[in-house]
């Protein structure tokens, strides 16, 4: 197995631990110092499957205080079952050690290997069983590829020729009963192992081959090679070339009649004292055998995840403990005593139906893995699983078509001039510390929290797009109210889609540029430019496919959600996707800029995020303004119906006129501009803007990320009861005035909430 894959799986375990523990800043730091790769696993269910932790996960869920992370599950498993490994085997006499010389095949060494190998020589009187237990006290963990913790992916080893197994009499009734039940259900056949060239010989006792009388030092490579000799590659041909045998072994799911091969036997192995192998035979015949499923054409990652066939080898442990079976059968996957106990418990719980054995599980998963590009539907037991999904899944096969380059000084100058009107200006602290973090208040989990004033226009626009995804797209369409109680994973997913829509729309639905921060400075500020510590570190990623854009944002969503510069990164991404040239063409006055005094968002910036164009007005289409001297000035407005609407207090004061493209959007969500602040207003009724009868009496929900809301604000709008416009405006909340620019004279009931004045 590739060490890179092992490293990525381990890193994914750490990321999952950090994510579940809420260590968001640590996650960001880890992603920056150790970026994800194509081998990274970013979905908790996938990670659990790679490590085969399904059984531990189910057991954990049944506990009163379940653990939250896979790393904790693994840790508890080892502490519970292998903390006292040395006590599992009592030693009354000195145990000889065995050394196996190196072979020509070079195998990697392990620093954790012991240099002495312990051999337990059990006599033939023990019911005819003979077993060799190697490295029991120090290297028991090497065989932890069992059913419980799950068949760790084996390393790349040279394959060996197959050999049959032999029958050993003396099975206990319980063990025989277990095999009979497995036979009836056509589950996994018994896997027999025998040395090459030997005939089947029914015996009660077997000879321990290669025993030496004294302790002999053995290198880590020797002990590692001994284990590799116990692995095997089943193949349809015994004349496989040596060059081909050095490749990654191909795994076949064999029929019930097939015999699993064991390690290749050689004269040196017999004469130099290789560990003897237990041979057990159970002959089975069944007509319903699964076909061969070679993994030859699967991608490297999928091949790496397949188990070595030797992990299906049966090992038997003889024990005299009162609380254990006299004869223990270790099912495919390694020497974990929990496997037998699980099998026995399963027989008692399910009657005659044993738990599915590892090979059948592997067959099903291999079929699914073999169909690249298809989504695998999983059995979801409860809603908790949805919350455990770690976002940012990186595709293992598909490569993103991304062109990346660092920002340069000229681009940074253009952006700053477009934002502030001068390259000497910088983002203030309100902008630098603002990202798209969600509220932890139970009734406001859908809301993005604003730290201070300034980028409220960007936050409101993103909030509207997130609500669009939460309420009216995907599975939320059937139950909009449920969309207001999203899981952490679901709301983050909706944030990804919202950001993707914004930058894709700004790029004319043809391209997008995503600006991400790095830990290195990309250029040295010189001349008429003032550094702010943000633009100088950017890397610009160009994409021309919407699907790639969504996937790319999933991988980097921490920079937007956790920050610290998420708001700045989105603003710059929208600008670069649109391009500075086209944005200046959108302006009525070419010298306009996107951020006004005190760091407030301009109407141009809000329009850029909502419609993809940084026009200066909110009316429909284009207005020709005749100055009277023959010169006509074109004032650009909104060109088409927007997904998210816009209402303004300025319209109440007759300063501007919001057109129907913004006032009647596709979705009942409006960004509200009131007294230099942007907030959000939305409805849960998707047909509110399509059926005039629903506009007689309906509810609107109000959210202000800066108002420190602690509860949901629900307004009931009644258009059948009109309010006189002559009412003293000083006592009327500005929000009501904004609402009446859309529904003239409507009454607004705050339903017990304090009106925001």
From Swiss-Prot:
Cleaved signal peptide residues: none
InterPro entries: MINDY-3/4_CD, MINY3/4
Region (Disordered): 141-170, 192-335
Pfam families hit by this protein: MINDY-3_4_CD
EC number: 3.4.19.12
One GO term (biological process): proteolysis
GO MF annotation, one: K48-linked deubiquitinase activity
Family that this chain belongs to: Belongs to the MINDY deubiquitinase family. FAM188 subfamily.
Name of this protein: Probable ubiquitin carboxyl-terminal hydrolase MINDY-4
Organism of origin: Pongo abelii (Sumatran orangutan)
């Amino acid at each position: 197995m590739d060490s890179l894959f092992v490293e990525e799986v381990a890193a994914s375990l750490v990321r999952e631990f950090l994510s579940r523990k809420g260590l968001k800043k640590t996650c960001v730091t880890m992603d920056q110092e150790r970026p994800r790769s194509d081998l990274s696993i970013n979905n908790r269910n996938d990670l659990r499957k790679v490590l085969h932790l399904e059984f531990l996960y189910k057991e954990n869920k049944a506990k009163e205080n379940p653990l939250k992370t896979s790393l904790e599950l693994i840790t508890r498993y080892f502490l519970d079952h292998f903390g006292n490994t040395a006590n599992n085997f009592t030693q009354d006499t000195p145990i000889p050690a065995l050394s196996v010389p190196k072979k020509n095949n070079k195998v990697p060494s392990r620093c954790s290997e012991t240099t002495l190998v312990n051999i337990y020589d059990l006599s033939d009187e023990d019911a005819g069983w003979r077993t060799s237990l190697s490295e029991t006290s120090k290297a028991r963990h090497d065989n932890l590829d069992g059913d419980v913790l799950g068949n760790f992916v084996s390393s790349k080893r040279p394959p060996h020729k197959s050999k049959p197994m032999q029958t050993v009499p003396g099975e206990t009734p319980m063990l025989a009963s277990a095999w009979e039940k497995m036979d009836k259900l056509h589950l996994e056949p018994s896997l027999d192992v025998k040395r090459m060239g030997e005939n089947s010989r029914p015996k009660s006792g077997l000879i321990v081959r290669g025993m030496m009388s004294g302790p002999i030092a053995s290198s880590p490579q020797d002990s590692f090679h001994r284990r590799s000799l116990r692995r095997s590659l089943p193949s349809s041909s015994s004349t496989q070339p040596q060059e081909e045998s050095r490749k990654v072994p191909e795994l076949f799911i064999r029929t019930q009649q097939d015999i699993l091969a064991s390690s290749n036997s050689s004269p040196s192995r017999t004469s130099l004292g290789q560990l003897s192998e237990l041979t057990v035979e159970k002959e089975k015949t069944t007509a319903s055998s699964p076909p061969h499923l070679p993994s030859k054409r699967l991608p490297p990652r999928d091949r790496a995840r397949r188990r070595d066939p030797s992990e299906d080898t049966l090992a038997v442990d003889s024990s005299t403990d009162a609380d254990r079976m006299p004869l223990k059968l270790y099912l495919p996957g390694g020497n974990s005593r929990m496997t037998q106990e699980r099998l026995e418990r399963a027989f008692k719980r399910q009657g005659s139906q044993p738990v599915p054995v590892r090979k059948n599980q592997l067959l099903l998963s291999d079929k699914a893995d073999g169909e690249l590009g298809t989504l695998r539907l999983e059995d979801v037991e409860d809603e908790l699983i949805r919350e455990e999904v770690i976002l940012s899944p990186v595709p293992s096969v598909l490569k993103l078509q991304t062109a990346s380059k660092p920002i340069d000084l000229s681009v940074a100058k253009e952006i700053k001039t477009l934002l502030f009107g001068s390259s000497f200006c910088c983002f203030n602290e309100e902008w630098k510390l603002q990202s798209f973090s969600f509220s932890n208040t139970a009734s406001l989990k859908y809301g993005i929290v604003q730290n201070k004033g300034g980028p409220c226009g960007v936050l409101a626009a993103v909030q509207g797009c997130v609500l669009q995804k939460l309420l009216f797209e995907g599975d939320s369409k059937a139950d909009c109210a449920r969309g207001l109680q999203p899981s952490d994973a679901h709301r983050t997913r909706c944030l990804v889609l919202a950001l993707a829509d914004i930058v894709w729309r700004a790029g004319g639905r043809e391209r997008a540029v995503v600006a991400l921060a790095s830990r290195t400075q990309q250029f040295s500020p010189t001349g008429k430019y003032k550094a702010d510590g943000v633009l100088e570190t950017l890397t610009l990623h160009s994409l021309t496919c919407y699907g790639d854009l969504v996937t790319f944002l999933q991988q980097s969503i921490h920079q937007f959600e956790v920050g610290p510069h998420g708001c700045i990164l989105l603003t710059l991404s929208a600008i670069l996707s649109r391009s500075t040239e086209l944005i200046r063409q959108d302006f009525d006055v070419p010298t306009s800029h996107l951020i006004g005094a005190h760091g407030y968002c301009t109407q141009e910036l809000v329009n850029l995020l909502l419609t993809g164009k940084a026009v200066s007005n909110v009316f429909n289409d284009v207005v020709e303004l005749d100055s009277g001297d023959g010169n006509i000035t074109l004032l650009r407005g909104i060109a088409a119906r927007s997904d998210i609407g816009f209402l303004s207090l300025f319209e109440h004061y007759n300063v501007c006129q919001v057109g129907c493209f913004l006032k009647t959007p596709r979705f009942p969500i409006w960004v509200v501009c009131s007294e230099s602040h942007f907030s959000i207003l939305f409805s849960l009724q998707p047909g509110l803007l399509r059926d005039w009868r629903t506009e007689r009496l309906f509810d609107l929900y109000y959210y202000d990320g800066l108002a420190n809301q602690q509860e949901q604000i629900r307004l009931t709008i009644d258009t059948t009861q009109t309010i006189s416009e002559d009412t003293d405006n000083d006592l009327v909340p500005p929000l009501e005035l904004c609402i009446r620019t859309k529904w003239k004279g409507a009454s607004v009931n705050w339903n017990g909430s304090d009106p925001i004045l």
